[in-house]
Amino acid sequence: LMWEQLNRIIKPNGAIVLFGSEPFSSHLRMSNISMYKYDWIWHKNKSGNVFLYKISPMKRTENIMVFLNGVLTPQNEPNITFNHNAKKSDKLMKTVMKNEGVQNNGKRKDDSYKKYYGNTGYEDNVLRYDVDKNRIHPTQKPIELLKHLVKMYTNENETVLDFTMGSGTT
């Protein structure tokens, strides 16, 4: 029922971004594997799951699952909103891909691409945000993390629906 309603209202190439931990995250991904595209990992400054510390690891990370109403391919890139925080231009990545990164068959020519790796300014999949000190609820998400995600997946003046709003951080 959740996916039926979300599919009814999502715009073409729109994103649905949901938080979770295992095993719930796996169930959520598999409940709509056709729209699931990738995860972010939220690395927290404080561990959760403190009441189970004797029998399980304390959780310092949380999954942020991204579901897209569209195809995630380079050809569809102009249609998908993804406002990343790249510090360097796409020109560098194009140079790497053309000159040093890959051959026509998609295989790497050699290890020369490694000098650029991690130096592009593009984000990796780990987002580091501290838990807000003045939160209302123990699972409340940091305002700065939510701002980052909203800016990443929407353009100015677009509508955002938070159907899991909990304490209303968004």
Put a short name on every predicted segment.
Residues L1-T170:
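Core catalytic lobe of class I
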